[in-house]
């Protein structure tokens, strides 16, 4: 109960309170957080990440005292945006089938978001570049969703804005989220569906792995990303993520310790080799899906 901790500090004459989180909800280090106090306090209260709290403690231990400068701001009525680019086939009628390549471009407070999810957004941009001159009879949509971290708001809004006719046009969604970590225990590139069932997208990913002689590509069950709203309305979709799974029932898995923390930066948490592998697997899966006849893809989706 943070309220009690803050009240105790106030009673002892504290001018401010720095709380810090030891561990996150997924085995990661504690992240910067909102203390969400239910009682109004007369002093400033901040929620620090584990790394920030430790650094502050070390500074105090060395010097006995230190000066910490913090800025607080209140924001309301914020707007989130989805960034959407479409590559239409020549002589488009507007009714062609479509393949979606997606990611989210937001991070959480206090985290640079190199792997979560600049890696996914970078992948979408690179595949947009790679496919710019590829002729197909299908539309390709490259989408960067906003506000994934606050509850899949961007993708949920997008899916809810589609008519049933528009939903039926989408053959599959390749959603990249955390595709470049260097964490050794996150040893496989998974194509995840919310219910664990295979679909057109996971089939394409596994086939791509075979074509590339890559045995690190596996299928699994996981939600918590922008593939979920699509799956909920029957559109084949999968999350691509580096993860290690020890057990599915109960679910015991590994993602990087620096997930959602200040250490999720390019220097500490990015593997160019894994990024390249994700690009190759997802790019090959997308290409193969685009090359299939509409009849083939509809049969796989059924």
Language-model-detected regions and their locations in the chain:
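Extracellular/luminal Protease-associated
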Residues: 1-44, 216
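Second-shell loop/turn segments in exported
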Residues: 1-6, 41-46, 71-73, 107-117, ...
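Active-site alpha-helical elements of protease catalytic centers
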Residues: 8, 12, 114-127
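Structural recognition of the beta-strand scaffold that forms the well-ordered cores
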Residues: 16-20, 45-48, 83-86, 98-102, ...
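Solvent-exposed loop/turn segments at secondary-structure junctions
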Residues: 22-27, 51-53, 75-77, 91, ...
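Soluble metallo-hydrolase cores and metallopeptidase-like ectodomains found primarily
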Residues: 34-114, 129, 133, 137-139
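Metal-dependent peptidase/peptidase-like ectodomains
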Residues: 135-136, 145-244, 248-249
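His/Asp/Glu-rich mid-to-C-terminal helical/loop segments that flank catalytic regions of hydrolases
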Residues: 249-302
